[in-house]
Each structure stands twice: as structure tokens, then as C-alpha cells.
Amino acid sequence: MNKSGIILIGTILFSSMAIADDLTAPIYTTGPKPVAIGKVTFTQTPYGVLITPDLTNLPEGPHGFHLHKTADCGNHGMHAEGHYDPQNTNSHQGPYGNGHLGDLPVLYVTSNGKAMIPTLAPRLKLSDMHNLAVMIHANGDTYSDNPPQGGGGDRIACGVIK
């Protein structure tokens, strides 16, 4: 095999390994007729999971952004159940606290309805995220238990992580 053949095989192998380090969730509105609004990509880094939204048609401002324990967005997002909490902390302390792992950094939506600002969830591992739901709430997030679940409010968009 010549040198260019070896380089080509190495490139293909490296590319497939890089692809394996991403998970994607197509995101849909949670209304009676769900509409596709984009996707969220999750990438493992040495510092945690990089979360890269590519979303449109959302209300401007900060939104609660969480992992939910069941990979089902049915019934207006209610089938996704509660926040992902594998250690049963029952505590909402944000992505940098010691509470449940379902807290993601707040999702910011610009005045044109787009969310594209990447964030980092330092306590998460990509291997923990298979078959979970990612949820976007109507309101911002206080990262506390008062109001309940940080005050995120209604579930306005949801996707299953694949």
C-alpha cells in the first residue's frame, strides 16, 4: 500500500472516531402539532460536554435547559418525566453545583428567535446521555429548589438524544 492509501485510511478512521464523540437531539415544539425547530449537538471534551444549539423560532431571552430522564417528548413534553438525577440528589443546584445532573447552562435566545451560543456542562459525560430527553422551558432558571425546579415553567420544546 502506498503512502497516500495509508493516509486515506487513517483519515477515515479518525473521522469515524470523531463522529462517535457526538450525540444529537432533533428539537421539536411540544404543542399538539410538533414542529421541527433545529437540533442540539453534544460533544465530549476533556472539560465536560460541549452543548451546541442550532435552534430557531424560540421566544427571546433566557430559557431553562435540562436533561430529562425519559427519552419521550410526548404529551407536551410531560412523558420525559423529571430531571435526570442518577444519584438521587433531589436537588436543583445548576450545572456547576452538586445537585442533579439534568441542569444544563441556560439557553439564550436572541431577538431573532435563534439559539446558537455553545455552552459547557462540566459534570456530564457523553456516555451518560444516551436515551435521555433535552428540554427547553418557557422561562429562565434560578438553579434552586424555590420556585420548584428553578422556575423554568412550561416545556416548550423537546428532543430525544441519539
Curated annotation (Swiss-Prot):
Listed cofactors: Cu cation; Zn(2+)
Subcellular location: Periplasm
Binding positions (Zn(2+)): 83, 92, 100, 103
Keywords attached to this entry: Antioxidant, Copper, Disulfide bond, Metal-binding, Oxidoreductase, Periplasm, Signal, Zinc
Catalysed reaction, written as an equation: 2 superoxide + 2 H(+) = H2O2 + O2
Disulfide links within the chain: 73-158
GO cellular component entries: periplasmic space
Top-level taxon: Bacteria
Cofactor notes: Binds 1 copper ion per subunit. Binds 1 zinc ion per subunit.
Chief site of localization: periplasm
One term of GO molecular function: superoxide dismutase activity
Its EC number(s): 1.15.1.1
Residues that coordinate or bind Cu cation: 66, 68, 83, 137
Subunit relationships: Homodimer.
Protein name: Superoxide dismutase [Cu-Zn]
Species, as recorded: Legionella pneumophila subsp. pneumophila (strain Philadelphia 1 / ATCC 33152 / DSM 7513)
Lineage: Bacteria, Pseudomonadati, Pseudomonadota, Gammaproteobacteria, Legionellales
Name of the coding gene: sodC
